[in-house]
Amino acid sequence: MSSTTTAPALADLPRAIRERDAAAQAALYADDAVLTTIDAEHGPSNPVVLRGRAAIADALADVCARDMTHDPTFFVHDDELASVGVACRYADGLRVHCLAAMRLRDGLIAEQTTVQAWDS
């Protein structure tokens, strides 16, 4: 008898983002995934680069623990690519908007580039 494992459904990403479910989000990444983040403090020449599901899971746990809302504004995907927009708002009113583009492998996120714009 053989057993097979099924990758978590990428279609669950908007719910996991909205509900700040870091574990469900992390489960959508490949073990060797690379997450690159570009923002005002880390431009294209010096982005934040996280390598591996464990590092990405730690970052997601930090973000999801913050007192803020996460509202997915759009989400599209096929077998190879995905993209999501997320409007975030901290309790003090500060807003952040994130756009992410992802390359998929075997139903999991293998590479992601996120661009963040923060209120100043």
Language model segments and positions:
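Short, low-complexity N-terminal intrinsically disordered segments enriched in polar/charged residues
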Residues: M1-A27, D31
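A solvent-exposed, acidic/Ser-Thr-rich amphipathic alpha-helical stretch
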Residues: S3, A24-D78
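A beta-strand edge to alpha-helix "cap/lid" segment located at domain peripheries
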Residues: S2, D58-S120
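Short charge-dense sequence patches
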Residues: S3-R15, V48-R53, I109-Q112
